[in-house]
Amino acid sequence: MTDTLPPNRVVFVHAHPDDETIGTGATMAYYAADPDTHVTLVTCTLGEEGEIHVPELSQLAAAEADQLGGWRLHEWHMSCDALGVADRRMLGGPGAYRDSGMMDTPANKHPRAFWGADLTEAAAHLVAILRELRPQVLVTYDPNGFYGHPDHIQAHRVSVKAAELAADADFRPELGEAHKVSKFYWTTVPKSALATMFEEFSQSDDNPFEGVTSVDDLPFGVDDSEVTTVIQGKGFGEAKLASVRAHATQIPPDNWLAVMAAKVGVDATTTEHYILVDGKRGPADPETGWETDLFA
């Protein structure tokens, strides 16, 4: 299949519909607009346990009709359309794995909860995709799943396992020829960026950090020295915001990205950061010391 694909290929692995847009939306739109790059999104669950911010849809909740997953699948498709990502896939197919809910909740024990999925079995689904597409780049979360959600942590574990197994010619050869990903990234946010946002919103009625006294108290964010890569997706802010709006059940209209865009301009939402954990770093920007291209 790679004979018919562009020369550059990247796979993003996310836990739920809407996760693709917050931390990687501008990056995905930026590369999807490049005719020499093929972008694939793999999402692991339908997000059945999510909150609902549209009152008239409240009965779709897991505790009611339990139909939120199907609705969110529709939102996910609209989000991908906004980002220009045509190749979007559900790990194992839609509904193979269920949203596990927040840590230490009953949803963790659901028979189909992604949190309880057999790691090798789940990874094999991703191995098949990696061997089919043969991407140079794989992107997912850090070991804490960015902020500690069980499905984010499991998405990290599955991605790590799949990258290992995809390169092992002895593992499930029927899934395709072995393939080694050249560069493996985790999503992240540097504390300097959080500090800027913290200050920007400190006197705002729309403060997403309300009740937080320091960026060090947040469950995410790393020292700038840990960051290796920044993607400046300027020109793709409107695409990212359209992607955010597509997830209406999960992200209210007055979300912090929309507020930031209104306050300081849409381009402020398009800077996204990563940590390269496997592979060779590309040329660094002389000012930041960070590489500026996932494929460099």
Swiss-Prot record:
Hydrolase in keyword set: yes
Classification via Pfam families: PIG-L
Key words, A-Z: Hydrolase, Metal-binding, Zinc
The enzyme's E.C. designation: 3.5.1.103
Reactions catalysed: 1D-myo-inositol 2-acetamido-2-deoxy-alpha-D-glucopyranoside + H2O = 1D-myo-inositol 2-amino-2-deoxy-alpha-D-glucopyranoside + acetate
GO process annotations (BP): mycothiol biosynthetic process
Enzyme class: hydrolase
Binding-site residues for Zn(2+), renumbered to this chain: 16, 19, 152
UniProt cofactor(s): Zn(2+)
GO molecular function, one term: N-acetylglucosaminylinositol deacetylase activity
Domain of life, per lineage: Bacteria
Database matches in PANTHER family: 1D-MYO-INOSITOL 2-ACETAMIDO-2-DEOXY-ALPHA-D-GLUCOPYRANOSIDE DEACETYLASE, N-ACETYLGLUCOSAMINYL-PHOSPHATIDYLINOSITOL DE-N-ACETYLASE-RELATED
HAMAP family in UniProt: MshB
Protein name per the record: 1D-myo-inositol 2-acetamido-2-deoxy-alpha-D-glucopyranoside deacetylase
Organism: Stackebrandtia nassauensis (strain DSM 44728 / CIP 108903 / NRRL B-16338 / NBRC 102104 / LLR-40K-21)
